[in-house]
Structure formats: C-alpha cells, structure tokens
C-alpha cells in the first residue's frame, strides 16, 4: 500500500493512496480531516480487538470503517447497491470505494498521518 500526505491550497492535509487502497485515502480526507482525537479512539478500539473475535465499526457520513483483530475494511456508504446492478463503468468506481488491508498496516498509516499533521 503506497501513500503520501500533502497539504492543499487551504492548508488541509490530503491523503493520496495507491490503486486498491484509494478508499482509505478518501476516508482520511472525508471522515478524519485531521481529527487526532478520532485517531486515538480508533487506535484504542483496535488495541481492544487484539486476540478477540469481536469486530468494531465506525460509520461516517461518506465512509464506514470496519476493524477486527487482523483486518480493516473501508467502504463507501453508498455501496449498498447490489454489484449485479452496476454496469462496467460503475465497477471501476466501486473498486475505488472499497479497500481492505491488514490491521497493523492500517495502524501504521494512522501513526504516519498523525506525525505529518503534528510536524506541519
């Protein structure tokens, strides 16, 4: 998973992610928006999941985050449509709206995101 953090013209932190993980970047840009308290909450929930079978989710305005003890899924809330209903052009959009990654990789992203915000 390749990614970078930048500032836009207004000074807002923007996260850009490689193909297959774009939804993680969209989630950071749309739902987190530099909220360090939210990052801390997510990190605490992830720590509580270790070694358990439990899952945790955080539903936002545009994206929902799901965590379990090993994996993370970020999914656009508008993906409630059945995939059979999507034409080929929409399947590409669908792929940009769903990302899966390992929990440890995701937590590393959050750590680097926090560091970028605090340093700039």
From Swiss-Prot:
Coiled coil: none annotated. It holds the Pfam family UPF0231. HAMAP family: UPF0231. NCBIfam families: PRK05248.1-3. Belongs to the UPF0231 family. This is UPF0231 protein NT01EI_0766.
């Amino acid at each position: 998973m390749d990614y970078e953090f930048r500032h836009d013209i207004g000074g807002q932190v923007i996260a850009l992610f490689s193909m297959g993980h774009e939804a993680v970047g969209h989630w950071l840009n749309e739902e987190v928006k530099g909220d360090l308290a939210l990052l801390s909450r997510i990190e605490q929930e992830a720590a509580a999941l270790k070694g358990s079978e439990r899952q945790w989710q955080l539903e936002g305005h545009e994206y929902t985050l799901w965590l379990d003890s090993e994996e993370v899924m970020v999914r656009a809330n508008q993906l409630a449509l059945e995939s059979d209903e999507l034409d080929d052009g929409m399947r590409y959009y669908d792929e940009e709206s769903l990302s899966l990654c390992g929990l440890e990789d995701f937590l590393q992203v959050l750590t680097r995101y926090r560091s970028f915000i605090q340093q700039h």
